[in-house]
Amino acid sequence: MMRRQQIMDAAKKVFAARGFGGATIESIAEEAEFSPATLYLYFNSKDDLFASLNLTMLQQLTSKMEHVRDQALSPQKKIDELARALYEVYLLDPLNVVNVLRYQSKERLQRLSPGLSSQISDYTRKCMNTLAEIFEKGVRNGDLLDRNPAAFADIVWSLFSGLVLWEDTKKGFGSGKDLLQPTLELALEVINRGIKKTDVH
């Protein structure tokens, strides 16, 4: 188990420094101080290794979403907490989160070993269902617009993904200031106001 974690820690560094395309099993093995053959004992391919990091992020994200969902808060307060929770997931490992979001694709999922592919699909579904459940009670109680909670979840996830990737892109333009947190909070505030149900007189 320690070897597997050591390999994943090394992979995080190499993917962060070189990106998915520039990383190789050999460079990851060198960083981990193992032979490439040792890496293949734990991971079938570079894709599987990268996806294992993806799975870790999904597990952390799902845990944060479940915490927000289970709090005894109003729907509006939960949406405020959602912005904080998403940013906390990003802070756990910013470069890995960026890489994971940048390289998500159906084609990549199809290249994974069946067991890992199934795990990622299951956790993605669980994460999005939990995100939808944060909105579900508010819709049911009439506090939020009567729309599909899954659509709200898709909007929030798209916003988070887009903002993370855009902030990373801006760094390439020489913009050194990280505005992800205030921008994410503003985006969720706009959503919060927009989906709040108001009485029409």
Give the role of each language-model region.
Residues 91-115, 167-169:
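Amphipathic alpha-helical segments used for helix-helix packing
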Residues 1-2, 13, 199-201:
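N-terminal intrinsically disordered/low-complexity leader segments
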Residues 6, 10, 14-48, 52:
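Helix-turn-helix
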Residues 52, 56, 66-96, 153-156:
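Hydrophobic alpha-helical connector segments
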